[in-house]
Amino acid sequence: MDPVNFIKTYAPRGSIIFINYTMSLTSHLNPSIEKHVGIYYGTLLSEHLVVESTYRKGVRIVPLDSFFEGYLSAKVYMLENIQVMKIAADTSLTLLGIPYGFGHNRMYCFKLVADCYKNAGVETSSKRILGKDIFLSQNFTDDNRWIKIYDSNNLTFWQIDYLKG
């Protein structure tokens, strides 16, 4: 199953979606294993939406299909507590319009997710890089509170059976 249909069918609001693109200007400078992340907001007026932060547009909301344009691989993670995830998804809307960056009053994609979940009561560890605390994909994927529910490179049989109910 492709990631867009998986998310539309199974992912709860607040799921975090990691993607890698076939071509990215920042991928060589980015120490994250997964190069981009967004928060699945859910549906609004029948449209599935993702909140992300990009270097060109800052924090914005985009249709799920647009989020996946040009993607190479995808992973989706969730927490056990769906209510916490909903709070994080709602928080993401309050950050719309913040410019992209690493300084004060700036937001890059992994910080967006970390801040939304911090507001929901879930602290995320960071890495100290060049004197700054930076959030990377590994800060989420290596944290056992996060459950991987989809991996486009490795859809295992137990996941297929689990998803069938």
UniProtKB/Swiss-Prot annotation:
Keywords of the record: Host cytoplasm, Late protein, Virion
Domain of life: Viruses
Annotated SUPFAM superfamilies: Cysteine proteinases (SSF54001)
Pfam families: Peptidase_C92 (PF05708)
Chief location bin: virion
KW Chloroplast (keyword) present: no
Localization per record: Virion; Host cytoplasm
InterPro entries (alphabetical): Papain-like_cys_pep_sf (IPR038765), Peptidase_C92 (IPR024453)
GO cellular component: host cell cytoplasm; virion component
Entry keyword annotation includes GTP-binding: no
Additional detail: Displays sequence similarity with a group of bacterial permuted NlpC/P60 proteins. Thus, the ancestor of the OPG091 gene might have been acquired from a bacterial source at the onset of poxvirus evolution.
Role summary: Contributes to vaccinia virus virulence in mice but not to replication in cell culture.
Family label: Belongs to the orthopoxvirus OPG091 family.
Protein name: Protein OPG091
Source lineage: Viruses, Varidnaviria, Bamfordvirae, Nucleocytoviricota, Pokkesviricetes
Gene that produces this protein: OPG091
